[in-house]
Amino acid sequence: MDALRLANTALAVDIFKKLCEKSATDNFVCSPLCISSSLSLIRKGSQGNTASELEKALHFEKVKDPDFGFQLLSSDISKISSANSLKLLKRVYVDNSIECKKDFINSAKKPYPLELETIDFKSQAEEARTQINSSVKELTDGNFETVLNEGSCDENTKIIMLGAASFKGKWVYTFNKSETKEMDFHINKKETKPVQMMHLEARLSIGYINELKTMVLEMPFQSKHFSMLILLPKDIEDDSTGLKKLEQDMTFEKYTHWTNPSMMANSKVKVSLPKFKMENSYDLKDMLKSLGINDAFNEEASDFSEMTESKGISISQAIQKACIEVDEDGTESADVSMERRLMNKEEFLADHPFIYILRHNKTRTIIMLGRYCGPSEAS
């Protein structure tokens, strides 16, 4: 399980860095776990160089049994998801004309429950698209209206890899709504935009990355199954968001070190954090190709002989939608009234761009990650 956690973390950092490269100043949220789970299922059906490319991108070099690892992880997370308002949908849709081997179907059921689905793209592409959209809408409680746009499926569609992730958790400690006030958020050294800033004083885990002058705060959600980790540079020191150095320096090893509980201390913290809601859609094909997954997208080169006898099969589309909402809701008030309010307190003022990670604490798995650079026009 630990080897799989490390592999999933390494892919999550790769994905994060690709999203940062794409744009220096955009807000984003993404679920690397949806991607790694679906890719692992697709890897299970592949052979030869197709399998090698997938295993390399997934960092599976030291993972002895990824299927069993995903089985335990899915089971752990699904048990606590509904109580924590987490919706994770991972699907690999395969066209009916591709006859999947019985062994493949049966062996995928436990590690990737409900993730493999057959559907009729060949003769009813538009109906298939509508059916997929309805299914995603229903399974995410209406969070996502349209995942596949009109014309995105046709009679040549073979495999669609699709992920949808949404989260709106309740913190352990409630932010007092009456203390939420409009404040300036520094988008860069020169510009500000108004945000609704929430305030809280509580005992929380906090760490510091000295070489990057960056604070790491852990904010637990109810029942402490999930936490949000927030990486906040002390100040904006570059000509952009202030995150450039942190984004460039982040590696899988460094992230693991920075967020290790032994690197953090329990302290009284005065937190100021913007309220926000963020949603993104991704066509993942180019990103996955840039991570070295090429054959799986190329029907001339792909080898899915563990899945089917059919030839000329490739992934037609890889799509993800993700959304996250952060507000004051919590389950208990932080009782700091007994301690004098301003004694020896760390201040965590998130009034400039930061990186955030939604983590499953038992396995330290990254469920979602993102970057907040300021209020979007819509919010």
Curated annotation (Swiss-Prot):
Its main location: secreted. Glycans are attached at residues 133, 176, 361. InterPro entries: Serpin_B9/Maspin (IPR000240), Serpin_CS (IPR023795), Serpin_dom (IPR023796), Serpin_fam (IPR000215), Serpin_sf (IPR036186), Serpin_sf_1 (IPR042178), Serpin_sf_2 (IPR042185), SERPINB5_serpin_dom (IPR033836). Keywords: Glycoprotein, Secreted. GO terms for molecular function: serine-type endopeptidase inhibitor activity. It is found in: Secreted, Extracellular space. The keyword Glycoprotein applies. Gene3D superfamilies: Alpha-1-antitrypsin, domain 1, Antithrombin, subunit I, domain 2. PANTHER family: SERINE PROTEASE INHIBITOR, SERPIN, SERPIN B5. Belongs to the serpin family. Ov-serpin subfamily. May not exhibit serine protease inhibitory activity. This is Serpin B5. It comes from Xenopus tropicalis (Western clawed frog).
